[in-house]
Amino acid sequence: MKNKSFAVIGLGQFGMTLAVTLAESDCDVLAIDDKEENIEEISEKVTYAVKADVREPGILKALGVQNVDVAIIAVAENLEASISATMQAKDLGVPFVVAKSMNSLHGRILDKIGADKIIYPEQAMGLRVARNLLSGGYLDVFELSAEFSMAEFSIPESWVGKSLIDLNVRERFHINIIGIKQGENVTVDLKPSEPLPDQIGRAHV
């Protein structure tokens, strides 16, 4: 069976990790970035690594991106490059185009120009952290927008007796605790310096 082939465009932390992981899973990976140091770092880890500016018209065709099964556009921080690469991949007939987005407006633009799947890695990371933080488990999530979600989870024993300042969840996990539920009562006026009592059941973030 033919190995599945991917083009990963943009080798920031997200793109670099994705490209290497796919290559380690025996996929054929074409990695593209405009920084020589990124190409040098990944060149021996993927099938092909090429330095190119994806804002240049026709560059993806010249690099053979039309031959891959999936193109992943991971250059969200540069809006022009993100749009250009997504449009080129779609025009080339790549079967499935995944585009990384930084916010809901960016996501709507990518949707309009035909991206098959739009991902928000920072949001996804926050949700994964919330799911895996606690032995009691992740209970529910409400998507408020492409950028924000609200989740409910059980408080782990390791948090009992510590204050929100001690836990520093905003810096460590990129979440904000907005309320604490005890029985049927929900407290939203939280005092960051007060330790969490042992009878707390759930937190909302």
Predicted feature locations:
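Aromatic pocket-lining residues of Rossmann-like dinucleotide-binding sites
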Residues: 22
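Short beta-strand element of Class I
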Residues: 28-30, 97
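Phosphate-bearing ligand-interacting subdomains
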Residues: 40, 45-129, 154
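Conserved acidic E/D residue at the C-terminus of a beta-strand in Rossmann-like folds
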Residues: 32-34, 101
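Cytosolic Rossmann-like ligand/nucleotide-binding regulatory domains
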Residues: 2, 9, 32, 157-204
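N-terminal Rossmann-fold NAD(P) dinucleotide-binding loop
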Residues: 15-16
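A charged, well-structured terminal subsegment
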Residues: 127-145, 158
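Hydrophobic Val/Ile/Leu positions in short beta-strands of Rossmann-like dinucleotide-binding domains
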Residues: 7-8, 73
